[in-house]
Amino acid sequence: MDIEKIYKESGALLKGHFLLSSGKHSPNYLQSAKVLEDPKKAELLAKELAKQIQAAGIEVDTVCSPAIGGLLAGYELARALGVRFIFTERKDGKMTLRRGFEVEPGEKVLICEDIITTGGSAMEAAKEMEKRGAEVVAFAALANRGVCQRTGSEIPSKSECKLPSNKTLFALADFTFPIYEPKECPMCAEGSEPIKPGSRGN
């Protein structure tokens, strides 16, 4: 499956000058919502991701996603795996489990995002699950930015990766784009202003 082709055809592989949530700049941005707005594509990608997880013999009771980016990917993955889906969300800046969701002690939870960059939000969701007695068995995403190493990839984890090295990351593809500190950004040097994705219809 050519994941990059699917992202391009969906208009989800954006080019420009973007301000990332990390505060760094990049000439590229992945907008998974553009892929996931098509239920057939969402189902196809989730089934492909589920195959990886099942082939690895990972036992999953529940898929949990951090809101809001991971919701559609996580729901479709849970459907493909035949398990339930829950999500965490921020309240007063802290990732929490709300809306009556509960997890049982020892429940095997897989954390799913649409895209993993450093894995910060995914790790926050994982800690919330562990705090409630669940066992986080793995992490998954449709796309991986190449900061954290996914299973089957030769690209090693970088120091910025926040995911634990003893838990497997499943993803369909690596998307490695240039990322710059603002003071080292060549686009800024040319006088370009960065756009925060979502702020101007992106």
UniProtKB/Swiss-Prot annotation:
Keywords: Glycosyltransferase, Magnesium, Pyrimidine biosynthesis, Transferase. Pfam families: Pribosyltran. Transmembrane segments: none annotated. Its cofactor is Mg(2+). 5-phospho-alpha-D-ribose 1-diphosphate binds at E113, D114, I115, I116, T117, T118, G119, G120, S121. Catalyzes the transfer of a ribosyl phosphate group from 5-phosphoribose 1-diphosphate to orotate, leading to the formation of orotidine monophosphate (OMP). This is Orotate phosphoribosyltransferase.
